[in-house]
């Protein structure tokens, strides 16, 4: 891992609580990333922050460090088993990842963490919360469920964090977010932080209504895609699209890659071809059960799978190390999703490769994407006669059977 992505700001030179510094030292964190270097001097003083920085630049540790520090330095004069900090994420996977990243800080400080997300573990999550929690990390639906049942009260909240804030304030979340924030103490009585790779003016305007004179921080505003990510664009016909993907996989031979498509059906089709070709490939779509979803991500992270085929459920916030390639089999309909997708590679100072297909169906999305990222994606040509022409017969997922989540789960029937 390179250190070029770090700033000259040392954690040890910040007025951090000694237990926080000890935890950071144990993880060999010496220098801040730019978003940490700009946000921590403010949040450590109790000032609200809305931070925008590229994916993989340390936003999670920025708000976790500030959250733990604030709780340690603002101890209440009463005993409570109710949460003192609320961290909200748009997806279950991201909530789990945040909790994982917080473990080392929790072990050192003895602050209690609990998760609350839908789709799995209702009773287990409930028991953990009832035993007492300092920092609650979760998704809006499950958190609201516990609030309405009277299990959780937010009277003692001192810190609120919205991670991937632009998605949180999407039309589907805004009412839930405002419901929860109205249950918390007033903005002047708490520290509130927003972080995201994309943060539009409209979102900032909505968010600032529930913040206390926040400071807006933006890192590398002129380049929304990481400068360590090499981008490449092909214009395949629909007929050539799968053959081009298989050919590029053979030529590039990526160590670990994610292939994004816009629909579950398309992801299943891609998975079917790659699994039939003998690739170690996993399938991550919205209907994969939560336990399988987490197991699949662990297999991919641990190197048991080389390729992950996914819808945008995997594009936001997940910290999957050493992803060398990202393929946009379909150009996303939402231009911001392009940034989040290719941000799966080129993380923490490493280089990466992004290859996109502007096919007949989705080429119309390209102008909006290029306008948003501020540059044209370099175009490469291909020779149709040089593509792999003996594609395997793809595996098909039968709807009356359990959907396999990786190629090794597949059995021919």
Curated annotation (Swiss-Prot):
Compartment annotation: Cytoplasm
PANTHER family reported in the protein's UniProt record: ATP-DEPENDENT RNA HELICASE RHLB, ATP-DEPENDENT RNA HELICASE RHLE-RELATED
Catalytic activity from the UniProt record: ATP + H2O = ADP + phosphate + H(+)
Molecular functions per Gene Ontology: ATP binding; ATP hydrolysis activity; RNA binding; RNA helicase activity
SUPFAM superfamilies from the UniProt entry: P-loop containing nucleoside triphosphate hydrolases (SSF52540)
Protein name, entry field: ATP-dependent RNA helicase RhlB
Every Helicase C-terminal domain range: 241-388
EC number of this enzyme: 3.6.4.13
Record gene name: rhlB
Summary of subunit composition and partner proteins: Component of the RNA degradosome, which is a multiprotein complex involved in RNA processing and mRNA degradation.
Organism: Actinobacillus succinogenes (strain ATCC 55618 / DSM 22257 / CCUG 43843 / 130Z)
Function: DEAD-box RNA helicase involved in RNA degradation. Has RNA-dependent ATPase activity and unwinds double-stranded RNA.
Pfam hit, one: Helicase_C
Alphabetical UniProt keywords: ATP-binding, Cytoplasm, Helicase, Hydrolase, Nucleotide-binding, RNA-binding
One GO location term (cellular component): cytosol
UniProt superkingdom: Bacteria
Motif range (DEAD box): 163-166
């Amino acid at each position: 891992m390179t250190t070029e992505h770090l700033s000259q700001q040392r954690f040890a030179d910040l007025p951090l609580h000694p237990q926080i510094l000890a935890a950071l030292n144990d993880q060999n964190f010496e220098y801040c990333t730019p978003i940490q270097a700009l946000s921590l001097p403010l949040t450590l003083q109790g000032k609200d922050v809305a931070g925008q920085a590229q994916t993989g630049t340390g936003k999670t540790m920025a708000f976790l460090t500030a959250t733990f520090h604030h709780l340690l330095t603002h101890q209440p004069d009463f005993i409570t088993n109710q949460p003192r900090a609320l961290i909200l994420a748009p997806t279950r996977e991201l909530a789990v990842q945040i909790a994982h990243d917080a473990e080392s800080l929790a072990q050192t400080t003895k602050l209690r963490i609990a998760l609350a997300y839908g789709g799995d573990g209702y009773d287990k999550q409930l028991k953990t919360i009832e035993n007492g929690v300092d920092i609650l990390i979760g998704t809006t639906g499950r958190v609201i469920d516990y609030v309405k049942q009277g299990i959780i009260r937010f009277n003692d909240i001192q810190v609120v964090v919205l991670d991937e804030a632009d998605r949180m304030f999407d039309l589907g979340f805004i009412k839930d977010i405002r419901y929860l924030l109205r249950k918390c103490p007033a903005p002047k009585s708490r520290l509130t932080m927003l972080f995201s790779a994309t943060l539009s003016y409209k979102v900032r305007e909505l968010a600032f209504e529930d913040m206390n004179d926040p400071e807006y921080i933006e890192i590398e505003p002129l380049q929304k895609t990481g400068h360590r990510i090499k981008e490449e664009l092909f214009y395949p016909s629909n007929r050539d699209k799968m053959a081009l993907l298989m050919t590029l996989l053979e030529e590039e031979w990526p160590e670990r890659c994610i292939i994004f498509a816009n629909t579950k059906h398309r992801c299943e089709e891609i998975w079917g071809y790659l699994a039939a070709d003998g690739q170690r490939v996993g399938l991550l779509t919205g209907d994969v059960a939560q336990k399988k979803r987490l197991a699949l991500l662990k297999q991919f992270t641990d190197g048991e799978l080389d390729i992950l085929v996914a819808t945008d459920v995997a594009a936001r916030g997940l910290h999957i190390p050493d992803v060398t390639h990202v393929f946009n089999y379909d150009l996303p309909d939402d231009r911001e999703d392009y940034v989040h997708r290719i941000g799966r590679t080129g993380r923490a100072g490493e280089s990466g490769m992004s290859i996109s297909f502007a096919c007949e169906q989705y080429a119309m999305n390209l102008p909006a994407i290029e306008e948003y990222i501020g540059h044209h994606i370099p175009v490469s040509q291909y020779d149709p006669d040089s593509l792999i022409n003996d594609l395997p017969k793809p595996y098909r997922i039968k709807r009356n059977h359990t959907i396999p989540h990786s190629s090794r789960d597949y059995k021919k029937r």
